[in-house]
Amino acid sequence: MKTFRDFKKKIKNNNNNKNNKNNNINNNNSNNNKNNKNNNNNNSNNIYTPSISIIDNYDTLCSTPQNLKSNLKKNLNINNQEFITSNILEIDWNTIIDIEIIDFGNSIVCLLVTLSSDNLHFNQILIKSTPTIAQECYASVLQNILKLPILDLRLLEKNNEFLEMSSNLLDFSKDDQFLNDFIKSEFEKTFFLIMEFRQNGKKFNELNHKEYFSGYKGQEKFKQLGKIIAFDIFCNNFCKTNIAGDDSSIYFSNIICYETPNKNGWYFSLINSNISCLNNSLFTIGYRYHMNSLKLLLFSIFQNPSTESFQIRMMREHLLKKLNIKLPKSSAVYIQKGIAKGIKSIVNYINYPLLENTKDKVKNIVSCDNYNIWKKGIDSIHCPFLLDVLNEIEIEISNRREKVYFVKI
């Protein structure tokens, strides 16, 4: 099998041959090979170090999303159009040319696999395993109904394709003990998501926030963040968006941000969304605490949409204190408008029969037994909590529907 080093040399040699048509091709190849060796020895910082190398440091091996395309583009001398749209179907696992570990933060770690069958066009996909596979698939179905910006994904079980995928990934990474061990540990899990990968994304805490959220486009981006918050509220995912003000969380850690919108107008992609019910009892303190926080936020938004709510102010203060991210006070109004629009969409499209039907559909995707993680995950999805949230939302909207100050979205 070709190594990434062989592939890199071939691309560099081809480019040099085009620029030096009158030179002898064999001499060019030998000279380039010598130069590559010298450059690797004398100036390794300027040459791409493929992931297939002996690296025993996890932080060194991991990449962050914004660096990925620049690395490949810089070192393979390729143009934007030569990166094809991420294709998660009919993957030829024999064409792997690179493997990276991406740490998105907040315990979200994926494999980024680059494939190419002709050395001219490239396909990049994410491989993700998760202990909350059932909840994540369940949330993805609901997100699709609400037209939220989820990445294209499909479920991969331990079948023939899994065997082909695993054998090729392990064979390609055999010279890198750390990467190989990481892949082996991932393959001990039962279910995997094959996910689309969008180029040029950044994590929320890596943005130039003043520049990114400036102007009219910035207002639209804040509204889109509000829609995402609305869904996380609905799923009791306070650990993600931290509406309750928990200092241990990182806001928006489950999104990737882009400079240009996708075909549906979204500037963001969701890479992780779970139904994370903290408890299932109506009578526990935690349950009522979250419900009361939700009611307070809804009341604030629908009662005074142009006034920053307590929860959104807590969010901005947290971002400034913990991450040194300063969002302007004016952002609160647009975020709250987005939350209101997201809530209205939930009320219009989600109901209790749909929640139960979705649970049944997800349960039927794979065969379940009484012991596997999928079955336990499905059983942990607590529809009564979601129904309680939905009821609270519907009550607030009903109470405010006739008011002139109802938020205009």
Swiss-Prot record:
Keyword Transferase (UniProt): yes
Extent of Low complexity compositional bias: 13-45
Coiled coil: 5-46
Gene3D superfamilies with a match to the protein in the record: Phosphatidylinositol 3-/4-kinase, catalytic domain, Phosphatidylinositol 3-kinase Catalytic Subunit, Chain A, domain 4
Keyword S-adenosyl-L-methionine attached: no
Region span, Disordered: 1-45
PANTHER family reported in the protein's UniProt record: ACTIN-FRAGMIN KINASE DDB_G0268748-RELATED, ACTIN-FRAGMIN KINASE DDB_G0279609-RELATED
Protein name according to UniProt: Putative actin-fragmin kinase DDB_G0268812
